[in-house]
Amino acid sequence: MRKEKLTYYFSVEGETEKWYLDWLQDRINESRDAKYTVKLDSKIQKDPLARAKGMTILQKTEITHVFDRESGDSVHARQFMATLDRMKAAQSLGKNIKYRLGYSNFTFELWIILHKANCNGAKTHRRQYLAPLNTAYGEHFESLEEYKHEANFQRILLHCHRESQR
């Protein structure tokens, strides 16, 4: 019996979020226990309004914008508020779009860490996620930039997949 297909729309800030959603789609669709097949339609687009303008909408559509705040610095706080304003503007295009907030803490790395470990305690800067990330996955990345190279990130996702198979 063929499964019904559900589509979910995302705009994401960067490559790691896109790679993660592609990986998640594959894991869901390969599961025999899944009631549906899914399409996680994600585009790297920091501006929610640009994502909405680029879509042909035939029916009411929800889009989730996944982004992080980076830090408590005023520049990042302003960027965060500007993104919220652009989400509101996207909903006013007359395209029947509902934009949802997919906020991911200071950094998307928290999502990845939580696949393997608890991450208790306050973190005030994104660089503080490097040590828990290395510990959780037995890695030795010297920077978050090194971790974000596609081959390294895909290795982390493969590790997540192997763990879920146990």
Predicted regions and their residues:
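C-terminal accessory helical subdomains adjacent to catalytic cores in phosphodiester-
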Residues: 1-7, 18-38, 49-62, 69-166
